[in-house]
Amino acid sequence: QGRVSLWLKDIITEYKSNFPEAHIVLSTWNTEDVSKIDCDIIQSELPVSTYPHSNTTNHQIIGVNAGLKKINAEIILKCRTDQFIHNKKIFELFNDNCPLDKIMIPDLGTTLDDDYRASDFCQLATSKILNKFWNNITFYDGKYAISPEIYLAKNYVVNFMKNTKPWNKIMNEYFHIMKYHSDFQIEFEKLANDERYANLLTVNHTEQIRDHDKKFRVKSHFFQ
C-alpha cells in the first residue's frame, strides 16, 4: 500500500517468485502511474491534507481498507510499496509462531516505552484480525501531533478492543513481535537513499536490541 516507488516493480517481481500462490494487490492513488505494474491494482483518491498537523494516517486508512476489500485470503501480509520483505518463509514463520488473534509486526519501530507505538512497516495476520484493525478507525483530524503507528494502534486497542490497561502490560495481547532484520528480512528504500533516516533507524534498532529479551519476550528465528 502506498505510492509507486522506484523499487515497486522489483518488489512485486520478487513477491511473485517467493509467493507464487499469493494474490498480490497494489493499493495506491489515482495520481500514480501504474502502467508498468504487473498485479491487481486499486487506485483511490488522495485524502485532503489535515491542519495544523499532517501525516500519512488517513492515507493508510484509505489505502489499506481499499486493498482489504479486494483480497479474499485467510492470511494477509500488509506491506509498503518501498520495502522488500525478503524472507521466503514469512508465512510459515507466522503459522508456526503467531497466535491467530494477534498481528505479527517487526521489532523496529515497536517499543513498550512509548505508549501504543507498534510498528506500521508491515503487518501479517488473518483477514479477520486485519479487518478488525483497519475497518474501525476514525480519520485523523490533524488537531494534535501524533505519529501514524501510535494513532492506529491506540485506536485498535483502546477504542475498538476497549482495553485501557497500561501499554507495557497489554502490547503482547494484540501484537506478536518478530525481528525486523532476521525474521522479516526487510530492505527499506529510505535506508538506501537517505543517510539521515538510516542513521536514525540504526540508533533506534541498536537500543531495542540491547533490551530485546526484556521488552519483547519473543523467540528468535533465522532463515537463509
Can you name each region flagged by the protein language model?
Residues R3-W7, N55-A66, Y144-Y151:
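Soluble or luminal CAZymes and related metallo-dependent hydrolases
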Residues C79-I85:
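Acidic metal-phosphate-binding loop of nucleotide-sugar-dependent transferases
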Residues L26-K70:
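Active-site-proximal specificity loops/subdomain of glycosyltransferases
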Residues K9-I12, A73, N87-D96:
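Short alpha-helix within the catalytic core of nucleotide-sugar-dependent glycosyltransferases
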Residues R3-N18:
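Short, well-formed alpha-helical segments that are part of the catalytic scaffolds
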Residues I76:
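Short aromatic/hydrophobic "clamp" motif used to bind/position activated sugar donors
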Residues Y15-L26, C39:
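Short loop->beta transition adjacent to catalytic acidic/histidine clusters or analogous donor-positioning motifs
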Residues I85-F91, I103-Q224:
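Catalytic core and acceptor-binding pocket of nucleotide-sugar-dependent glycosyltransferases
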